[in-house]
Regions:
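The beta1-alpha1 cofactor-binding region of Rossmann-like NAD(H)/NADP(H)-dependent oxidoreductases
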Residues: 56-66, 98
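Active-site helix of classical SDR
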Residues: 116, 152
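Substrate-binding pocket helix/loop in short-chain dehydrogenase/reductase
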Residues: 92-93, 97-105
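Residue(s) in the substrate-gating loop at a strand-loop-helix junction
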Residues: 136
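Conserved glycine-rich Rossmann-like NAD(P)H-binding loop of the short-chain dehydrogenase/reductase
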Residues: 27-43
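Active-site loop immediately N-terminal to the catalytic Tyr-X3-Lys motif
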Residues: 94, 141-147
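Conserved glycine-rich cofactor-binding loop
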Residues: 13-14
Length: 164
């Protein structure tokens, strides 16, 4: 269908995900950019015509499956996934807000696991595909006022290493 490579990047609205989306788009890739904040994705679309936005809540399995299907329907396949999903709320750590820490775990760890699970069948079917998972140095050592974030990135690092 289309001979350009297709990369799906989650967490593409800010930070590393946004930077990667722009760099891949400038290199000629079709970038399927996903994040929760649709307004930031729309801003990203304006930067380069090779970037298409696919709003996504990584914690919602049905939404994740829908996004994978939309990307495949639009481009024919997904060649590479880069999962940069992440959130942090330093204020929740200071007050030890368990519900916020659970949300951090849900997004940073389970959300990435969910994304891997949603793309897995597609990669098996086409017998090809690569996954890159962006974690953090916080996955290897504790940081002040960041216990929930560090725990989520540590779990993500261990999960990623188990995929080899």
């Amino acid at each position: 269908m289309i001979n350009k490579k297709i990369i799906w990047i989650t967490g593409a609205s800010t930070g590393i995900g946004k930077d990667l989306a722009i760099k891949f788009a400038k290199s000629g890739w079709h970038v399927a950019a996903s994040a929760r904040r649709e307004n930031l994705l729309l801003d990203l679309n304006k930067i380069n015509q090779n970037i298409s936005s696919f709003p996504l809540d990584v914690t919602n399995t049905e939404n994740c499956k829908e996004v994978v299907n939309k990307i495949i329907n639009r481009f024919g396949a997904i060649d590479i996934c880069v999962f940069c999903t992440g959130m942090h709320d330093p204020n929740s750590e200071k007050r030890f807000n368990l519900s916020k820490i659970r949300e951090i775990m849900e997004v940073n760890f389970f959300g990435v696991m969910n994304s891997v699970n949603c793309i897995y069948d597609h990669f098996c079917e086409k017998k090809n595909g690569k996954i890159a998972i962006v974690s953090s140095v916080a996955g290897y050592r504790g940081l002040p006022a960041a216990g929930g974030y560090c725990a989520s990135k540590s779990a993500l690092t261990s999960f990623t290493e188990s995929l080899y």
